[in-house]
Amino acid sequence: MNAVITVVGKDKVGIIHGVSGILNENNVNILNISQTIMDGYFTMIMLTDISNSTKDISSLKEIFKEFSLKNSLDISVQHEDIFNSMHRI
């Protein structure tokens, strides 16, 4: 099962490190990643494989919610199918 993780916030040191560390701790594999800085704002989208994760998607959402609050970021974790259906033209 795949999940899409999006991260947006003011750019600062350690965002990718923090997000990838959470994924590593929970055995989540990054399949694809795109990130950019736009006028001082960090944006990243990741496609991840959560099939072998030690946590279910709801638990991962809670972990990222806590991380996002501590770091003033907007982080979304969605099942790939939900993400795709929400972003169709």
Swiss-Prot record:
PROSITE patterns per the UniProt record, alphabetical: ACT
Matching InterPro entries: ACT-like_dom_sf, ACT_dom, UPF0237/GcvR_regulator, UPF0237_ACT
ACT domain residues: 4-84
Protein family: Belongs to the UPF0237 family.
Protein name: UPF0237 protein CPE1496
Native source organism of the sequence: Clostridium perfringens (strain 13 / Type A)
Pfam family, one: ACT_6
